[in-house]
Regions:
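Active-site substrate-recognition segment that forms the wall
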Residues: 107, 115-123, 209-211, 217, ...
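N-terminal Rossmann-like FAD-binding beta1-loop-alpha1 element of flavoenzymes
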Residues: 30-57
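C-terminal catalytic lobe of FAD-dependent flavoproteins
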Residues: 307-309, 314-424
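Dinucleotide-binding Rossmann-like beta1-alpha1 core, especially the glycine-rich loop
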Residues: 78-160
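Helical element adjacent to the flavin cofactor pocket in flavoenzyme catalytic cores
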Residues: 137, 141-145, 170-230
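Helix-loop-beta segment of a Rossmann-like dinucleotide-binding subdomain
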Residues: 21, 118-128, 161-195, 199, ...
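Glycine-rich FAD pyrophosphate-binding loop
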Residues: 50-70
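Extreme N-terminal leader/targeting segments of oxidoreductases
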Residues: 1-32
Length: 427
């Protein structure tokens, strides 16, 4: 049987109070059945409830069990593909609409935190750190591109300036985005779940969707119950399994690994990140890190294709941390865990309909914290009959992985090896 308890992570250890939630053991009827109580599902549910829909959420494990409660906690704007790449793929009109939405997810998070008084250690400020002149040139282009779409809270930093905000000698410069930032991701999910329930929504935990009965009046079956709904939103992402085979064929779960140090104390914590900003480098296979409210360092990186859990996470990530911060060589690691995100071949999200009444969003490809909150709003708009923004995402190409589900992992790993060489040699 699959493990449905939270992993032994820093987030689970420092989570706010988690109320018990029921297992679905009846037949219920609702307007919208949401499958998955991660960010996509919770964001969808909140927007729908705020607009008068009855909503039932089915969660196979616990609220925020998947990527939403395990990620690096960074509020990173835009998508995993730059908007200019999207423009070359879909043309200027569709790219303009997608570009205008690229910075909305972070605003939604802040609005939710304020409106529902969610305690999740929200901090402003995110740094993109360049390891080479080539990467710095890319950041300069990215700043110009983002400013085209009205995103102006950006500062290019030379080597001297980035050293003021990151206590690491390996960066040649960077870009500071003050509308970026970081949060305790599990506490954000728990707060959003409480908001769903405060508006009359129902969340069932330990209630996996095992079958969707499609048709004019779709039914979602769980081991002990079922939900009849006008609409279904599929929001399982990397933890969906094969519930919807046509979605599984066009995406691949991938694992990323995270460690958390023991408390560092004020002096050492301030030496690493004086302004409490979060940081990610500009490599294809990137490293990311941030401070916590209790003066620890969370550091993540690495990709394991096919969602396998590595045997020794600390052995993979600690050397990356020490390369950035050798002064942490004697610091103890208190927590190490892995979590899955869903990769698409295009590295763009996949959004669409199955028939007239089953909607889905998946495949954030590493930019899930902000995109999922936007996705919830866009899905809710579509169910209300306002589908222009939904269609802008739905019209993006959904490419299958070469070789199907059997060969997608080795093909992706080969691609990652190639990009890892590019990172190593600055190509």
């Amino acid at each position: 049987m699959a493990n449905t308890q939270y992993p032994e992570s820093y987030y689970a250890a420092s989570a706010n109070a988690v109320p018990p939630r029921p297992v679905l053991q009846d037949d219920v009827e609702t307007d919208v059945c949401v499958i998955g109580a991660g960010y996509t599902g919770l964001s969808s549910a909140l927007f729908l409830l705020e607009n008068g829909f009855r909503v039932t959420v089915l969660e196979a494990a616990k609220v925020g069990f998947g990527a939403s409660g395990r990620n690096g906690g960074q509020i990173v704007n835009s998508y995993s593909r730059d908007i200019d790449v999207i423009e070359r793929t879909v043309g200027p009109k569709q790219a303009q609409l997608l570009g205008e939405m690229a910075f909305e997810g972070g605003r939604i998070i802040r609005e939710r935190v304020a409106r529902y008084n969610i305690q999740c250690d929200l901090k402003d400020g995110g740094v993109f750190a360049a390891l080479s002149a080539k990467q710095m040139g890319h950041l300069e282009s990215q700043k110009r591109l983002w400013e085209r779409f009205g995103h102006t809270q950006l500062e290019l930093m030379d080597q001297r300036r980035i050293r003021e905000v990151v206590g690491c000698d390996q960066y040649v410069g960077g870009m500071l985005d003050m509308s970026g930032g970081h949060i305790h991701p599990l506490n954000l999910a728990l707060g959003e779940a409480a908001a769903v329930e405060s508006l009359g929504g129902t969340i069932y935990e330990q209630s996996p969707a095992v079958r969707i009965e499609r048709g004019a009046n779709p039914v979602v079956h769980t081991p002990q119950g079922k939900v009849r709904a006008r609409f279904i939103i599929v929001a399982g992402n990397a933890y969906l399994g094969n519930l919807v085979p046509e979605l599984a064929a066009k995406s691949m779960p991938c694992g990323t690994q995270v460690i958390t140090t023991e408390p560092l104390g004020d002096e050492l914590a301030k030496a690493l990140l004086p302004q409490d900003y979060c940081v990610e480098d500009c490599n294809y296979l990137l490293d990311y890190y941030r401070p916590t409210a209790d003066k620890r360092l969370i550091f993540g990186g690495g990709v394991v294709y096919g969602a396998r859990d590595p045997a020794n996470i600390e052995a993979i990530i600690r050397p990356k941390m020490l390369k950035a911060f050798p002064q942490l060589k004697d610091v103890k690691i208190d927590y190490a865990w892995t979590g899955n995100f869903l990769l698409t071949l295009s590295r763009l999200p996949q959004v669409g309909r199955l028939g007239d009444n089953i909607y889905y969003s998946q495949g954030c490809s590493g930019h899930g914290v902000t995109y999922t909150h936007l996705a919830g709003k866009v899905l809710a708009e579509a169910l209300r009959g306002q589908a222009e923004r939904f269609d802008a995402f739905a019209d993006l190409p959904h490419y299958p992985f070469p070789g199907g589900q059997l060969l997608r992992t080795p093909f992706a790993a080969l691609g990652a090896w190639y990009y890892g060489l590019r990172d190593k040699y600055g190509l």
